[in-house]
Amino acid sequence: MAIAKSVRARAVGLRSLRVLCAQRSVAREFSVLNRPQPNYPGHIPLTPIERGALAIGSAVGSLLNPRRGDLIATVGETTATPFFIYRLRDAMLADSTGRRILRDRPRITSQTLSLPYLRNLPKNTVGYTYATWLDREGVSPDTRSSVQYIDDEECAYVMQRYRECHDFYHAVTGLPIVVEGEIALKAFEFMNTLIPMTGLSVFAAIRLKPEEKQRFWSIHLPWAIRSGLASKELINVYWEEQLERDVNELREELNIEKPPDLRDIRKKVREQKKAAKEAVIKS
């Protein structure tokens, strides 16, 4: 009996030793000083602790400075896994156009899109709307950083695609890149994509001026919820094939409601303030 107990104890001890060795082996396989090979060019594998720390630090930094696009991009990547980016990928796999996009892997840059050509399209087209929006806002499709922190190679492309399509969302909604406009668009994107970063961006509204907050809560947030939920999955739009289409026709097809022109609203507010100031001076 004593011998049997001794044998069982030794067996348990050996199993525990094997588990401990396996855990140490895994730790050696993936640690700060010993990372696995990247899954695609530019990929940086992260441990769960590193991912969490990077997500929190980037979220705080982007909240303090909403113009830090690099921090916002990092928050997007580190909070999209393990569930949300797979949900978006699965939405593409469930759609015929989404599957084509995943197969073709198109990229949106100034090399893949001829901006001079788009500027000469009829004014009611998607391409003209996109190009003139870029010109008005002074931005370029080449400013989108490459995905680094998503482990799955296909999901990394999905995030890259979302990132490069962001300016098309701006163009068809007409929202400018001022902080107020970015927050409104991020709220719209959250309702449409469920990417956590887009929802977290709404907290940046606390840094808006009082009149901007009032507009956001009363006009643009209700619009974002309403339109974001009603519209089709925008990740499945093959924008490169829509450039010559009527932009209003595409909005109707995608069920996108265009919000009130934010630049026009801000301009009128400035003019009213200027007129009121001049009236005080004259009096």
From Swiss-Prot:
InterPro entries: Coq4, Coq4_euk
Keyword Ligase: no
GO biological process: ubiquinone biosynthetic process
Gene Ontology cellular component terms for the protein in this record: extrinsic component of mitochondrial inner membrane
Signal peptide: none
UniProt-listed Enzyme Commission number(s): 4.1.1.130
Transit peptide region: 1-25
Enzyme superclass (EC): lyase
Short name of any one Pfam family annotated for the protein: Coq4
Pathway per the UniProt entry: Cofactor biosynthesis; ubiquinone biosynthesis
Subcellular location: Mitochondrion inner membrane
Family named by the database record: Belongs to the COQ4 family.
Function in brief: Lyase that catalyzes the C1-decarboxylation of 4-hydroxy-3-methoxy-5-(all-trans-polyprenyl)benzoic acid into 2-methoxy-6-(all-trans-polyprenyl)phenol during ubiquinone biosynthesis.
Name this protein carries in UniProt: Ubiquinone biosynthesis protein COQ4, mitochondrial
Naturally occurring in which organism (per UniProt): Coccidioides posadasii (strain C735) (Valley fever fungus)
Gene coding for it: COQ4
